[in-house]
């Protein structure tokens, strides 16, 4: 069997062939053992067709996401120690078009029993992700309620593929056909694959290159659903690739994060902040709309000023990552407030210079980030070089930076920057702002009914537009 397999592994993956051969040979051994323990005849008569349409779920105007439940992998080892499938499924169910579940035991610490556990929690189709080489596995996947399977052309010849795909389709299951190079892509097209997954991972050295999606996607006929797989870590990468792919399969980058809810938001919606929160209800509105960060303003002259106790009360409303906004405060005071409240970051909105930032960095716990805001009128300012985790650009009107409700000339921005953008953002201009390639957007007066009063409808409108891509 390994000789037959070796013939069909693409030339580009020859150096990795022995690893794939080992994985697949181990899979054949697993299949024989499983057939003995759970013969096909014991469950085949009970099989029903899937009623969750994988192909339909991946259709539509917006970018789709197949989010993956993955405990471990050969390249990364153990990825998620606390593998709470109920929690994972409850988060994914809010954002995914389909959910992928690793079922390979030896290399990914998966199990077929994971499939029904996830499926019971969600309404979306569930994809069984495994090294499929035998029709028995397809039947087994359906027995455990999978609605779709992965077929990898790096380990299947055309006849094997046709056989497995036919079994899947007879059971009402969809097929995600994975390719990793142009040769496999040509085969997928000839095999009339409805959904083609482009694996950005190089099977020779396990590195990832997102340009593979850009190179291969234009070769795929119109009407085929294109999914970009592997190496997706940021919303900016998603936006960059969205014109080449209909959707993304994302697993490892999410599974590695302890706060899965915010990790998914960051990739699907972006790393956005709602600033000027003054009440726990407003924190709830921001969180429910899709925000990652919540801003608390400790500048007394601001209409949205909060003291430490009001900030603590506001923070109790929702589990956002909270950012304290300060302006020319003594560094020791900033560090004290940030530490007391357990802030995610402090944002400096005054004339704080490098010496101040160095002093503050030495006073803050390492886990608390430092963000620096700059006012922009007609030119981009020089950014502080050290100890700044994020730079934020806001409109400067006269001597006032920030809180003006105005935008600066966005044509000044570099394409695909690591900057946060603030100033006059609202439902009217958010779609345009989202295309600028910034790391995140910072909303305040544009989502309010009155200063310091966030408007749930305006927030929902803004975040719905952020999802329209």
From Swiss-Prot:
- InterPro entries xrefs: Aldolase_TIM, Indole-3-glycerol_P_synth, Indole-3-glycerol_P_synth_dom, Indole-3-GlycerolPSynthase_CS, PRAI_dom, RibuloseP-bd_barrel
- Annotated Gene3D superfamilies: Aldolase class I (3.20.20.70)
Named in its record, the pathway it takes part in is: Amino-acid biosynthesis; L-tryptophan biosynthesis; L-tryptophan from chorismate: step 3/5; Amino-acid biosynthesis; L-tryptophan biosynthesis; L-tryptophan from chorismate: step 4/5
The segment annotated N-(5'-phosphoribosyl)anthranilate isomerase runs over 272-469
Which GO molecular function entries does the Swiss-Prot or TrEMBL record give? indole-3-glycerol-phosphate synthase activity; phosphoribosylanthranilate isomerase activity
Keywords of the record:
Amino-acid biosynthesis, Aromatic amino acid biosynthesis, Decarboxylase, Isomerase, Lyase, Multifunctional enzyme, Tryptophan biosynthesis
- Cite the residue spans of the region called Indole-3-glycerol phosphate synthase: 1-271
- What does it do? Bifunctional enzyme that catalyzes two sequential steps of tryptophan biosynthetic pathway. The first reaction is catalyzed by the isomerase, coded by the TrpF domain; the second reaction is catalyzed by the synthase, coded by the TrpC domain.
Q: What's the protein name?
A: Tryptophan biosynthesis protein TrpCF
Q: Give the species.
A: Vibrio cholerae serotype O1 (strain ATCC 39315 / El Tor Inaba N16961)
Its gene is: trpCF
């Amino acid at each position: 069997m390994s000789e037959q397999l070796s013939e069909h592994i693409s030339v580009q993956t020859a150096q990795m062939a022995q690893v794939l051969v080992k994985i697949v040979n181990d899979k054949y051994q697993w299949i024989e053992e499983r057939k003995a323990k759970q013969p096909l005849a014991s469950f085949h008569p009970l099989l029903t067709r899937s009623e969750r349409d994988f192909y339909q779920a991946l259709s539509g105007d917006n970018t789709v996401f197949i989010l993956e439940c993955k405990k471990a992998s050969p390249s990364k080892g153990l990825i998620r120690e606390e593998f709470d499938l109920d929690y994972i499924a409850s988060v994914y169910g809010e954002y995914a078009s389909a959910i992928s579940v690793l079922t390979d035991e030896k290399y990914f610490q998966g199990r077929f029993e994971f499939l029904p556990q996830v499926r019971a929690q969600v309404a979306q189709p569930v994809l069984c992700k495994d090294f499929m080489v035998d029709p028995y596995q397809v039947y087994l996947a359906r027995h455990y309620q999978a609605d779709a399977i992965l077929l990898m052309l790096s380990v299947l010849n055309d006849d094997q593929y046709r056989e497995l795909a036919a079994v899947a389709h007879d059971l009402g299951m969809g097929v995600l056909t994975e390719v990793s190079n142009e040769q496999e892509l040509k085969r997928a097209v000839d095999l009339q694959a409805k959904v083609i997954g482009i694996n950005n991972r190089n099977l020779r050295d396990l590195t990832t290159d997102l340009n593979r999606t850009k190179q291969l996607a234009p070769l795929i006929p119109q009407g085929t659903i294109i999914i970009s797989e592997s190496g997706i870590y940021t919303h900016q990468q998603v936006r960059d690739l969205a014109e080449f792919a209909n959707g993304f399969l994302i697993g490892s980058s999410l599974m590695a994060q302890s706060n899965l809810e915010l990790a998914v938001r960051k990739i699907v919606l972006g790393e956005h902040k709602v600033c000027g929160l003054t009440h726990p209800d407003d924190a709830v509105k921001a969180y429910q709309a899709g925000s990652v960060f919540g801003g608390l303003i400790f500048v007394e002259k601001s209409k949205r000023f909060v003291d430490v106790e009001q900030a603590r009360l506001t923070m109790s409303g929702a589990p956002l990552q909270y950012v304290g906004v300060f302006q020319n405060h003594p560094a020791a005071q900033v560090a004290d407030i940030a530490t007391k409240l357990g802030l995610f970051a402090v944002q400096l909105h005054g004339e704080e210079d490098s010496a101040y930032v160095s002093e503050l960095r030495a006073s803050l716990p390492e886990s608390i980030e430092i963000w620096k805001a700059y006012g922009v009128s007609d030119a981009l300012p020089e950014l502080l070089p050290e100890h700044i985790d994020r730079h934020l650009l806001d409109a400067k009107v006269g001597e006032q930076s920030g809180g003006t409700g105005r935008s600066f000339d966005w044509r000044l921005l570099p394409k695909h920057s690591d900057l946060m953008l603030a100033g006059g953002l609202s439902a009217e201009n958010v779609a345009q702002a989202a295309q600028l390639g910034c790391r995140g957007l910072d909303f305040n007066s544009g989502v309010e009914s009155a200063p310091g009063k966030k408007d749930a409808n305006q927030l929902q409108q803004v975040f719905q537009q952020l999802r329209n891509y």
